[in-house]
A protein has these predicted regions:
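Conserved N-proximal alpha/beta basic substrate-recognition cap immediately N-terminal to
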Residues: 1-48, 296
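Generic preference for hydrophobic
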Residues: 44, 66, 104, 126-129, ...
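A short, glycine/Asx- and small/polar-enriched loop/turn
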Residues: 61, 184-191, 291-295
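Short, flexible turn/loop "capping" segments at secondary-structure junctions
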Residues: 68-70, 140, 290-295
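Internal nucleotide-binding/catalytic subdomain
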Residues: 77-190, 197-199
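Active-site "cap" helix and flanking loop/linker of ATP-utilizing ligase/carboxylase catalytic domains
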Residues: 158-180, 186, 196-258
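Peripheral (often C-terminal) accessory segments that flank ATP-dependent C-N-forming ligase machineries
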Residues: 221-327
Length: 327
C-alpha cells in the first residue's frame, strides 16, 4: 500500500496519500497517531530488541498481544501471559516484520467487531458493524464466524460507531474504504484493535453486498478513477441479517489431516438461507489446526430473519460438506 500511494502521489493520480498509507500499515505509527488524537485503544509499546521488548511487555502488562509492527493475516501474532511467553515468541514476531519491529499491546477482553466505513471527500460513512467471533487457543486472532448485525445495541452500538469514525478521521483517510476492528467490553467501552485502508478479506465485501446492498469493489474502482461517488453507492440500500461460517478445523467442521476427497457444495448451497459458499481445498493438501487466516479453507454465507437464525443456518450448512482425510 505505501508503494502504491507513493506512485499515485508522484503521478498525480487519486490515492490515499503516503502519510495515511504509512499510518494504516505500520501498527506503531498507527497507535501513536490514535493516541495523539484521543481515540481509545489498548496500552502499547514498540520493540526491536529483546531488552526493548521485555521492557515493553512489562510496561504494558499481561495478558497482552505481541505482533509484527507491519504484517497481517495473523502472521507472527501471539498472546502473552508471562514474560516467558514473550521470550519464546519475539523472534517469530520480528521475523514477520519487514522493518524488524514488533509491538506489544494490552489484551482487551470483550466482543470483537468488524467495521466497514467508506470515506468520501473527508466524510466517514459507517456501513456495517458485525460480530467477529474467534476460536480459542493459538489462533485467537482469526475470525472464524462473522454475524451481522452486531449483537450489541443502544449506547454500546452508538459508541462503537463513533469510535470507528473517529479512528478513520484520526488516520487521515479522506477517500477510500476503511476496515476498523474494535473490541467492546462488557461495560460498553470501545477500543480500537487496528484500522486498515482497503477492502478487507474474510468475505467482508460479500457481507457488504448481501447485508446492505453496497458493492465495495465498485466504490473502490470509482474512487481510483477519481469519479464522484453518489449516495446510492455508499449508503445501505437495505439491512439483511446474515452470518458467515468459515470452514476450518476444530472448532470448525473440518477434520485435520491430509485431504483424500472433497465433496461437492450441492447440499450446502441447497440449505435454506444459504446465498453463497465456496471451498478452497484440493486432494493432497493438509488441513491444520487454526493458526493463521489462511487456515480458513472455505466459507458459507447464510441469511435469515434474525442474525441468530442466519448463524444457525450457516453453521448447519457448513457441516454438510463432506471432506475425507488421512489422519
Amino acid at each position: 500500500m505505501p508503494v502504491v500511494a507513493a506512485v499515485a502521489e508522484a503521478l498525480g493520480l487519486p490515492g490515499i496519500g503516503t502519510e495515511t498509507a504509512h499510518l494504516m500499515t505500520h501498527k506503531v505509527a498507527m497507535r501513536r497517531q490514535l493516541a495523539e488524537m484521543g481515540v481509545p485503544q489498548p496500552r502499547f509499546a514498540a520493540a526491536r530488541t529483546l531488552a526493548e521488548g521485555r521492557l515493553a511487555a512489562e510496561t504494558v502488562g499481561f495478558p497482552s498481544v505481541l505482533k509484527p509492527a507491519d504484517s497481517g493475516g495473523q502472521r507472527g501474532v501471539f498472546r502473552l501471559d508471562s514474560i516467558d511467553d514473550f521470550d519464546a515468541h519475539l523472534h517469530a514476531a520480528v521475523a514477520e516484520s519487514p522493518t524488524g519491529e514488533a509491538i506489544v499491546e494490552g489484551f482487551e477482553e470483550g466482543l470483537e467487531l468488524n467495521g466497514l466505513v467508506i470515506a468520501r471527500n473527508g466524510e466517514a460513512i459507517p456501513l456495517t458493524l458485525s460480530d467477529r467471533l474467534r476460536p480459542p487457543g493459538i489462533g485467537f486472532g482469526v475470525g472464524w464466524i462473522h454475524v451481522y448485525p452486531a449483537t450489541i445495541y443502544g449506547h454500546a452500538l452508538e459508541e462503537a460507531e463513533r469510535v470507528a469514525i473517529a479512528a478513520v478521521h484520526a488516520l487521515g483517510l479522506e477517500n477510500g474504504i476503511a476496515f476498523p476492528q474494535l473490541i467492546v467490553s462488557d461495560s460498553g467501552e470501545v477500543t480500537v484493535v487496528e484500522v486498515a485502508a482497503r477492502i478487507p478479506g474474510g468475505q467482508m465485501a460479500d457481507l457488504a453486498r448481501h447485508a446492505v446492498g453496497v458493492d465495495l469493489v465498485e466504490v473502490a474502482l470509482r474512487q481510483a478513477l477519481g469519479e464522484e461517488i453518489p449516495d446510492e453507492l455508499v449508503f445501505p440500500q437495505f439491512r439483511q441479517p446474515l452470518a458467515i461460517r468459515f470452514l476450518t478445523a476444530e472448532p470448525g467442521p473440518l477434520p485435520t489431516g491430509k485431504v483424500q476427497r472433497v465433496g461437492t457444495l450441492d447440499k450446502v448451497l441447497a440449505f435454506p438461507g444459504v446465498v453463497q459458499a465456496d471451498v478452497f481445498l484440493q486432494e493432497g493438501e493438509t488441513i491444520r489446526p487454526v493458526r493463521l487466516d489462511g487456515d480458513r479453507r472455505g466459507y458459507v454465507i447464510a441469511t435469515g430473519d434474525t442474525n441468530l437464525l442466519a448463524l444457525e443456518r450457516a453453521v448447519a450448512a457448513a457441516g454438510l460438506l463432506d471432506v475425507e482425510v488421512e489422519r
